[in-house]
Regions:
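Multi-pass membrane glycosyltransferase architecture that uses lipid-linked
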Residues: 1-213, 264-414
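Short hydrophobic/aromatic helix or loop-helix immediately within or flanking a transmembrane segment
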Residues: 40-43, 53-77, 222-259
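Transmembrane-lumen/periplasm boundary regions of multi-pass, lipid-linked membrane glycan transferases
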Residues: 194-221, 229-242
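Basic, Lys/Arg-rich DNA-contacting stretches centered on the C-terminal catalytic core
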Residues: 213-214, 256-262
Length: 414
């Protein structure tokens, strides 16, 4: 019964309806970004004051496209309009996963398992899984990873679009270039598409504001949910004179303030870049040693993406959604080999929902039980990072025996 498309689609719609209901009605306003930020941006844009064109913006300009689409029902029903955009976007992913899944075929069974995991992951992560612009980039990235080995140019073009919505998918292009044999097609398609989109952005008159998102993000401090902030959150509890939680109204977020915070904040971006670069070098060595792309792409992508979370100074809860793209690829192509990262990723999603939205007031109040929950979540991210790196390294040490796990041959990958 679980393999019937009708059951999957019913679960898909039920989860989206529930998350939208919570997001729009809960007292903590989990979809506040949608109704209190996206809607005014769109209304201003329709009036001629376009973010990313008239002035710098926190996102690349293409992010405005899905926000504009959500205005389909008008400003009063903008939240419902956003839900429609998200449902359509995610429905494309689910339809893609269910395409060509013949009964009894191993490929079909794995893709259905991946679809179920993804739906469950969204439910566990909570309303933030749908109530941020990240949902569009994850959907595009998911399809890009799934087609990367057979259609690398398509993957590159898709990831260029995703990168012009939010920057993080660019690391997936790097992982694809390292892991697959037809790397040139992916790289050329990505660069050509990104440049074409960039020229389009400049054509609407954005000028230097088209790159404003780079400076907007780099100037941020340590957000309270970030793994690196955990130390100062505990210091704020035991010694409020040394560290505190402070609201920053200009970016609508809470950050830690205290001795050493500025220095740590300055270090995080270089550490994040070093992590990604080191993993790409490791991936290149593993690929050169003879590991097949079908084995390598999913764990390498997962390691790099989780590294973005571990070394990120922002640490917003919706970032956890990024994990879904490489895990879905791993389940769809390797099955049981990805049970551990899939289970750990699902657990991280569930704990993240406790942190936000349901426990966020307790976190701001520095209640000890909530700090324990946050610490466990951040520790789990570090564990998942280590697990993914180990999976990549293991391919280099003994990529031959890994075949006993029977991942799909590359000719059968989506």
């Amino acid at each position: 019964m679980a393999r019937r498309p009708a059951v999957l689609w019913s679960a898909f719609l039920a989860v989206h309806a529930w998350l939208a209901f919570v997001g729009l009605t809960h007292a903590t306003l989990p979809w506040g970004d949608v109704t209190l930020q996206y809607r005014p941006w769109v209304q201003n844009a329709l009036a001629g004051d376009i973010v990313g064109v008239s002035h710098p913006w926190v996102y690349p300009l293409v992010a405005l496209v899905p926000m504009l689409a959500a205005m389909v029902l008008g400003p009063e029903l903008y939240g419902i309009g956003w839900l429609l955009v998200v449902v359509v976007t995610n429905a494309v992913v689910l339809a893609f996963l269910l395409a060509r899944t013949g009964p009894g075929a191993r490929l079909g069974a794995l893709k259905i398992s991946a679809a179920w995991w993804w739906i469950g992951f969204l439910l566990l992560l909570g309303p933030v899984a749908l109530g941020r612009i990240d949902v569009t980039t994850v959907a595009i990235s998911m399809i890009a990873l799934l087609v990367a080995q057979r259609r690398p140019a398509v993957a590159g073009a898709l990831l260029a679009i995703a990168t012009w919505i939010k920057v993080w998918p660019a690391v997936l292009v790097a992982a694809i270039v390292v892991a697959i044999h037809r790397r040139g097609s992916a790289a050329i398609a990505f660069v050509a598409s990104a440049v074409a989109l960039g020229l389009g952005v400049l054509a609407v008159g954005s000028g230097a504001n088209s790159l404003g998102f780079i400076f907007e993000q780099s100037s941020r401090g340590l957000q309270i949910e970030a793994p690196v902030s955990t130390v100062w959150m505990w210091i704020a509890l035991v010694d409020p004179a040394s560290a505190t939680v402070q609201y920053i109204p200009t970016i609508n977020t809470f950050q830690v303030v205290g001795a050493g915070v500025a220095e740590a904040s300055a270090l995080m971006t270089p550490l994040l870049v070093a992590s990604s670069a080191s993993l790409l070098v490791l991936g290149a060595l593993v690929a050169r040693s003879g590991a097949r792309a079908v084995h390598l792409l999913a764990p390498l992508s997962l390691a790099i993406v989780v590294g973005l979370l571990v070394f990120n100074k922002v640490g917003s809860p919706q970032f956890v959604l990024w994990i879904a793209a490489p895990v879905v690829l791993g389940i769809a192509t390797q099955g049981r080999r990805f049970v551990a990262p899939a289970a750990l990723g699902a657990g991280i999603a569930a704990v993240t929902q406790i942190v936000y939205p349901f426990g966020y007031d307790a976190l701001l109040a520095l209640q000890p039980w909530m700090l324990v929950v946050l610490t466990l979540r951040n520790a789990a991210l570090v564990v998942l990072f280590g697990l993914a790196v180990h999976m990549v390294w293991r391919l280099r040490r003994a990529h031959g025996p890994v075949r006993r796990i029977h991942p799909l041959p590359e000719s059968q990958v989506i």
